[in-house]
A protein has these predicted regions:
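Juxta-kinase regulatory segment immediately upstream of eukaryotic protein kinase catalytic domains
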Residues: 1-25, 58
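Nucleotide/phosphate-binding site architecture used for ATP/NTP-dependent chemistry
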Residues: 10-11, 18, 50-51, 57, ...
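ATP-binding glycine-rich loop module of kinase domains
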Residues: 24-69
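Conserved hydrophobic "DFG−1" position in protein kinase catalytic cores
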Residues: 37-38, 46, 81, 90-93, ...
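Short, solvent-exposed loop/turn segments at secondary-structure junctions
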Residues: 42-43, 49-51, 84-85, 94-98, ...
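Conserved structural core of kinase catalytic domains
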Residues: 71-133
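Conserved hydrophobic core/spine positions of the Hanks-type protein kinase catalytic domain
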Residues: 138-139
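Catalytic-loop of the protein kinase fold
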Residues: 143-155, 160
């Protein structure tokens, strides 16, 4: 497992070196990858697996095609650049409220989860988001209009504060 993290960090370092950028602080990490700020006020996310990179990049490309930088009052980072060999995407840095992290999203096809799984997921998300759950559902519905189906919905990815 540490090998994958080391590889993601090495990919991030190669990405910035290839573009004459510098890494600043780490902004976060999760199952999908690791995110750093750069010296040009952008964020780069080095993904741990190629399918995650492809999903993240392709969702950002769809957002770009439709000129989406805001959904229901939440900022959406714009795609700046990417590297398909290093599995890195570069986006604008946005402040809350925001919607971000699309590595687990589905494009043009709704994920096929069993009803029992979806019922449990709905309960968990309602509890996590509390009074904002209706707003989260509206954000998800708006993205579905563009063929984007969010799967990794959590307060770190959809933030109102």
């Amino acid at each position: 497992m540490f090998g994958l993290w080391n590889e993601a960090v090495a990919h991030a370092q190669s990405y910035v070196a290839n573009r004459g950028l510098q890494l600043r602080q780490e902004l976060g990490r999760g199952y999908d990858g690791i995110v750093f700020a750069t010296d040009r006020q952008t964020a780069i996310k080095a993904l741990r697996y190629e399918p995650l990179f492809q999903r993240e990049r392709d969702v950002y490309l769809r957002l770009r095609e439709n000129d989406i930088s805001e959904i229901q009052g939440c900022n959406v980072p714009r795609l700046v650049d990417w590297d398909a060999e290093l599995w890195v995407v570069e986006t604008e840095i946005v402040k809350p409220p925001f919607v971000l992290d699309f590595a687990d999203a589905y494009l043009d096809e709704k994920p096929d989860f069993p009803k029992s799984v979806m019922a449990r997921w709905q309960r968990e998300k309602r509890q996590q988001f509390g009074a904002n759950w209706d707003r989260v559902q509206t954000i998800m519905a708006n993205l579905r209009r563009y063929g984007i189906y969010l799967a990794d919905v959590k307060p770190g990815n959809i933030s109102f504060e």
